[in-house]
């Protein structure tokens, strides 16, 4: 299955690529946060495939009754797990708290408490499907992987815990902006998991 993953920066060129049929094989869009919701809605309209997303630290608090606080037609996957085709996909939004009143920002302890809320569904998946998760999407990177020295871009240790417990085959995130000048790779393999920073977008083919 081919997935369009996006995060953190609007790439208007994607609109013309969508219209030209360049993405005709895309079956799913995954948003990893900090993108204007109209941008995600436009991609959804052009490709006419499901869209799952998690909020970033620059996104509003989710409110399904407020058209400005959710993606119309998309599914907010924060702290949720669902099955799409044959893939089990989970989401974890937000990043490390770097402002006292920051939206979708959490201390390391708060992030752990949020992550624990996914545990019952992960265990149920393990019983029903023999595996907890195939794909994990987050805004923040894990602690020590694709993160940065600045506090605002420090990874969340709770995501490391989720990777250890759920052992997904794929983990996609944003938040840290890998530019061409960066020497660090944007893809890493840890254990059974391929970890990819999808900024600003990547087309990824996933398999079981």
What are these regions (language model features)?
Residues 10-14, 35-41, 57-64, 97-102, ...:
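Active-site environment of divalent metal-dependent phosphoester hydrolases
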Residues 23-24, 44-48, 71, 162-167, ...:
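Short, conserved loop/helix-junction motifs that constitute active-site signature segments
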Residues 1-46, 124, 128-132:
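N-terminal active-site segment of His-dependent metallophosphoesterases
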Residues 14-20, 38-41, 63, 76-77, ...:
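A generic local structural motif
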Residues 5-13, 59, 65-154:
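Conserved catalytic scaffold of divalent metal-dependent phosphoesterases
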Residues 81-85, 160-166, 178-208:
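Binuclear metal-dependent phosphoesterase catalytic core
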Residues 5-7, 28-34, 51-57, 77, ...:
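Active-site neighborhood of phospho(di)ester-bond hydrolases with catalytic His/Asp-centered motifs
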């Amino acid at each position: 299955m081919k997935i369009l993953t996006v995060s953190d920066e609007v790439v208007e060129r994607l609109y013309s690529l969508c219209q030209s049929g360049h993405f005709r094989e895309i079956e799913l869009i995954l948003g990893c946060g900090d993108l204007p919701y109209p941008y995600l809605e436009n991609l959804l309209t052009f490709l006419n495939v499901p869209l799952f997303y998690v909020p970033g630290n620059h996104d509003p608090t989710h409110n399904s009754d407020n058209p400005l606080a959710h993606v119309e037609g998309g599914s907010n996957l924060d702290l949720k797990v669902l099955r799409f085709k044959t893939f089990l996909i989970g989401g974890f939004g937000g990043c490390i708290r770097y402002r006292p009143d920051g939206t979708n920002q959490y201390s390391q302890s708060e992030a752990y408490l949020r992550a624990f809320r996914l545990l019952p569904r992960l265990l149920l998946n393990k019983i029903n499907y023999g595996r907890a998760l195939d794909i994990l999407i987050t805004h923040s990177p894990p602690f020590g992987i694709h993160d940065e020295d600045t506090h605002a871009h420090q990874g969340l240790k709770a995501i490391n815990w989720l990777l250890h417990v759920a052992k997904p085959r794929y983990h996609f995130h944003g938040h840290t902006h890998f530019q061409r000048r960066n020497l660090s790779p944007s893809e890493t393999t840890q254990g059974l998991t391929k970890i990819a920073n999808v900024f600003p977008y990547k087309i990824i083919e996933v398999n079981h």
